[in-house]
């Protein structure tokens, strides 16, 4: 018998599960490529802000053409510091320039996957990537996972390390703190296990505190029964 599961409620997109993006500071993207393709823009950091939707602080930068943009703040950035975006930007923390212009061995973050997309890779607090080698038609970068990934030389990146590192070193300790962490992004918390529920609420529920049936389930199972190891090839420890 099918149950009304949490993931079925989540799929309806009610406010219980919707991200409170109206509280977030805004999008963090690079200046459009057509503006800084041939010239370098100079900007000044006006303020450093907490963003509840991110693991890193953001900095508001005012550029010389009068526009203001949010950037991911690098470690060591200061209010009043000048930063540059463009192909002729100096090699310094917080500056953004194409990967073709960044020397090997440099820490970078917020790397574009496609030239002009505004930055897609390495954006979490405390993360950084390493420029490993440069060739005529590609730049090889080591991502935080250790993967070596190829990027086009025109893809832009920011020099430095994303601020906000070490946030996971301090233990949460109290459930109340975990509550506020989840509330900031409207995460569904606490999330009870299926075996702790009543039998009417979950296929694994009931007072016996064991599933009572195989935890593997077909890929074609109806939504109310599709919980556990979905279409698993194998379960348990490998012998």
Curated annotation (Swiss-Prot):
GO terms for cellular component: cytosolic large ribosomal subunit. The keyword Ribosomal protein applies. Residues 222-239 have a biased composition (Basic residues). Keywords: Ribonucleoprotein, Ribosomal protein, RNA-binding, rRNA-binding. One of its GO terms (molecular function) is structural constituent of ribosome. GO terms for biological process: cytoplasmic translation. InterPro entries: NA-bd_OB-fold, Rib_uL2_dom2, Ribosomal_uL2, Ribosomal_uL2_arc_euk, Ribosomal_uL2_C, Ribosomal_uL2_dom3, Ribosomal_uL2_RNA-bd_dom, Translation_prot_SH3-like_sf. It comes from the Archaea. Residues 200-239 are annotated as: Disordered. Gene3D superfamilies: 2.30.30.30, Nucleic acid-binding proteins (2.40.50.140), Ribosomal protein L2, domain 3 (4.10.950.10). SMART domains: Ribosomal_L2, Ribosomal_L2_C. One of the primary rRNA binding proteins. Required for association of the 30S and 50S subunits to form the 70S ribosome, for tRNA binding and peptide bond formation. It has been suggested to have peptidyltransferase activity; this is somewhat controversial. Makes several contacts with the 16S rRNA in the 70S ribosome. Part of the 50S ribosomal subunit. Forms a bridge to the 30S subunit in the 70S ribosome. Belongs to the universal ribosomal protein uL2 family. This is Large ribosomal subunit protein uL2. It comes from Thermococcus gammatolerans (strain DSM 15229 / JCM 11827 / EJ3). The lineage of its organism: Archaea, Methanobacteriati, Methanobacteriota, Thermococci, Thermococcales. The gene is rpl2.
């Amino acid at each position: 018998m099918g149950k009304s599961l949490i993931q079925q409620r989540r799929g309806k997109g009610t406010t219980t599960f919707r991200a409170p993006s109206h509280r977030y500071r805004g999008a963090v993207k690079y200046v459009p490529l057509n503006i800084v393709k041939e010239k370098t823009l100079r900007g000044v950091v006006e303020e450093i802000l907490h963003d509840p939707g991110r693991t890193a602080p953001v900095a508001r930068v005012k550029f010389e053409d009068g526009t203001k943009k949010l950037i991911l703040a690098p470690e060591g950035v200061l209010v009043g510091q000048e930063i540059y975006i463009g192909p002729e930007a100096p090699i310094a923390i917080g500056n953004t320039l194409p990967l073709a212009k960044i020397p090997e061995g440099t820490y970078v973050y917020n790397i574009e996957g496609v030239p002009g997309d505004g930055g897609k890779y390495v954006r979490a607090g405390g993360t950084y990537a390493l420029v490993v080698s440069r060739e005529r038609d590609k730049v090889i970068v080591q991502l935080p996972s250790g993967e070596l990934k190829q990027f086009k030389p025109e893809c832009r990146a920011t020099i430095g390390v994303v601020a906000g590192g070490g946030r996971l070193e301090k233990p949460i300790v109290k459930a109340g703190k975990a509550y506020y962490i989840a509330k900031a992004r409207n995460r569904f918390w606490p999330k009870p296990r299926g075996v702790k529920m009543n039998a009417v609420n979950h296929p694994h529920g009931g007072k016996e505190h064991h599933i009572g049936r195989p935890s593997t389930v077909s890929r074609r199972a109806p939504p109310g029964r599709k919980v556990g190891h979905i279409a698993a090839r194998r379960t348990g420890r490998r012998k």
